Every structure is written in structure tokens, then in C-alpha cells.
Amino acid sequence: MKKIIMTGGGTAGHVTPNLALVPELKKLGYEIKYIGSIEGIERKIIEKEGIEYFPISSGKLRRYFDLKNFSDPFKVLKGVFQAKKIIKREKPDIVFSKGGFVTVPVVIAAHLNKIPVIAHESDITPGLANKLATPYCTRVCVTFPESVKHIKGDKAVLTGTPIRRELLEGNKLEGIKLCGFKDNKPILLIIGGSLGSKIINEIVRKNLDNILSKFNIIHICGKSNLDENLENRKGYAQFEYVNEELPDLMKASDLVISRAGANVIYELLALKKPNLLIPLSKKSSRGDQILNAASFEKSGYSLVLKEEELEDKTLIKKLNYLYENRNVYINNMSKSKMDNGVKNITELIKKYTK
């Protein structure tokens, strides 16, 4: 039996694409193992899938000054030795890396063990982890056509992003039942990313009366961000984080407000959900979400509201515009030729398996 080690972590966006590949890889006869961080979000998600998980030391990679920049390289080095030992023992035929700081030691360790590595970059420009890992990769899968020029060494392959099959098979009635909605108002789903978004949470709750006059709200607000005062608010259902329930909640929604991570926006495209994107600003990111959002806005798939322009009036104005023009966005998304990347990526994995 062929064996693959997968890696990726830090946020759900570095894990869920791996899960999308798992059923197809199993169908192709691969035994799957996973290397991730000790305390990252990926550990709980992967172990829940029944996949053997190997935790390693990992240091966060930062583009800004921090005292931990002096200690974290030693954590990365420790992670390389740990990953090298795991890879030597497990003898995988190939490694698949989805990005995130934990992947750098794994990719380097695979290279040292002469194991081929396929990486995947979701955003238009590569994150720091994938930039550092690219020299040790065999091929780098990309999601946007614009990304090819940003990958060094002629290693880029345009594959699209992998989307979990179950996400496309949600049940609308189950989603509505889960939220306890009793009327027929259109449903607005708000997603702030797996860690939540303080600024989106605050402005939505500040304008709750206004929004609830037109919509029922599903609010995925992130860990420790539930508001106890709103627990029994009619038409408002809040969740810290959802996994199995997400397909049903997505199916139930008519509009979506979201950050602009590549994974989630491609999921919205696949589901043809009219969406308002609020990308992370350059103050708190490297600007990748701004580029992602601009690409989708240009294609007519999304309406965009910059974080710097996020105010009560602009939010309500954009939301009303999106609802009034929802069919235009649905029609534009219906014309998209973007494929689910599962088949393209698994074919590449097959090709480079030792």
C-alpha cells in the first residue's frame, strides 16, 4: 500500500483542504498519516477523522519584530529533527503540504529523506511558510491563475483548491432547524474565519436590530466570542465554531459576509452564494486577502468592503445592495469554469509518488 504524510496547520484554512483530499486518496489506496503542531487547531480536526497524528515542535514565522523571533528558529530546527525521525520511520512515498508554519520543518525533513513533496498555496501570493518551503518542494499547486508567476523555479501547477464533497451536500431544512428560525426571512451567514473576527463581530452586533429587521442571522463568531446576552435573541443564532454542521448552515444561507481567505471564497463560489467580503487589512496581514477579494470582485463573484471603510452605514448599504442584486452574482458564479481541485491535486500526487 502507498503511504502519504500530510501536513498543514495553524488555522482551519490549512487543514480543511487536506480533509477534502482524504476520501479520494483512500479510494486510490493511500495509507494516510499526519504531522502537525502540538497544540494547533489541526490536531483535534485530524484525530477526529481517525487519522494517525504525529505532533512536532514548530515556531511561528513572523514578518515583524518580536522577541520570539530569536527563540522560534530553534523550535523549527527541533521540528526538523522530529519530522525527519518520523518520516524515516514511517517511510512515506510522498508528502503533501498545505502551508502554515508547522509545514516548514516537515518539508525540509522530507527533502532530507529524499521524499517528493507536493505543496498547495491557496492565496494569490505565497505565504511565508510556502515561500521558505518552495525550494524543497517538487511541485507547488496554486489556486489562482495569477499565482503562477509568484512561485519560483517553474514549480507552479494550476490545480484550483480542493473542496470537501460533503460541503456541497448540505440540507437547508436541517440548517434552519439547527438555528431555530421560525419565519421565512432570508438568511445571512456571517463567517469571521476559524479564529473569529473581533471587528466583524462588533459591527454586526452593534447593527443587530437593523439587520434583523430584514434577515435571520447565522453568526459563526470564533472561539470564546459568544455573547451570552444574545443567546435567546429571535432570528439570531451564534456559534463559536462549526464543522459537521457547516454544510447545512451554508445551504440554508441566502447571503454570506466573510473574510476573504482563498478556501472560503472558493467554497462560496462552488455553492454560488452571493457574498460580501471584508478582507483582513494590511495592518493585520500580508495583504493576501485583499488580493483574493479583488480577484473575485473583478470576476463579478463578490462584493467587497475594505476593513478601513467598515462602518455602520457602509455595512448596511453594501448588504442591501448585495441582496437586491443577488441574482446577478449567482449568475456570474454559475458561469465560472473553476474546478474543484481534488481531482487535479490527487492526479499530481499519483504522478510523483515514488
Curated annotation (Swiss-Prot):
Pathway: Cell wall biogenesis; peptidoglycan biosynthesis
Binding site for UDP-N-acetyl-alpha-D-glucosamine: T11, A12, G13, R164, S194, Q289
Recorded topology in the membrane: Peripheral membrane protein
Any one GO CC term of the record: plasma membrane
An MF annotation (GO) of this entry: undecaprenyldiphospho-muramoylpentapeptide beta-N-acetylglucosaminyltransferase activity
Enzyme Commission code: 2.4.1.227
Gene3D superfamilies: Glycogen Phosphorylase B
Reactions it catalyzes: di-trans,octa-cis-undecaprenyl diphospho-N-acetyl-alpha-D-muramoyl-L-alanyl-D-glutamyl-meso-2,6-diaminopimeloyl-D-alanyl-D-alanine + UDP-N-acetyl-alpha-D-glucosamine = di-trans,octa-cis-undecaprenyl diphospho-[N-acetyl-alpha-D-glucosaminyl-(1->4)]-N-acetyl-alpha-D-muramoyl-L-alanyl-D-glutamyl-meso-2,6-diaminopimeloyl-D-alanyl-D-alanine + UDP + H(+)
UniProt keyword DNA-binding, yes or no: no
EC class: transferase
Subcellular location: Cell membrane
GO aspect biological process, one term: carbohydrate metabolic process
Keywords: Cell cycle, Cell division, Cell membrane, Cell shape, Cell wall biogenesis/degradation, Glycosyltransferase, Membrane, Peptidoglycan synthesis, Transferase
InterPro entries per the UniProt record, alphabetical: GlcNAc_MurG, Glyco_trans_28_C, GlycoTrans_28_N
SUPFAM superfamilies xref list: UDP-Glycosyltransferase/glycogen phosphorylase
Domain of life: Bacteria
Family label: Belongs to the glycosyltransferase 28 family. MurG subfamily.
Function field: Cell wall formation. Catalyzes the transfer of a GlcNAc subunit on undecaprenyl-pyrophosphoryl-MurNAc-pentapeptide (lipid intermediate I) to form undecaprenyl-pyrophosphoryl-MurNAc-(pentapeptide)GlcNAc (lipid intermediate II).
Stored PANTHER family: UDP-N-ACETYLGLUCOSAMINE--N-ACETYLMURAMYL-(PENTAPEPTIDE) PYROPHOSPHORYL-UNDECAPRENOL N-ACETYLGLUCOSAMINE TRANSFERASE, UDP-N-ACETYLGLUCOSAMINE--N-ACETYLMURAMYL-(PENTAPEPTIDE) PYROPHOSPHORYL-UNDECAPRENOL N-ACETYLGLUCOSAMINE TRANSFERASE 1
Protein name, as recorded: UDP-N-acetylglucosamine--N-acetylmuramyl-(pentapeptide) pyrophosphoryl-undecaprenol N-acetylglucosamine transferase
Organism: Clostridium botulinum (strain Hall / ATCC 3502 / NCTC 13319 / Type A)
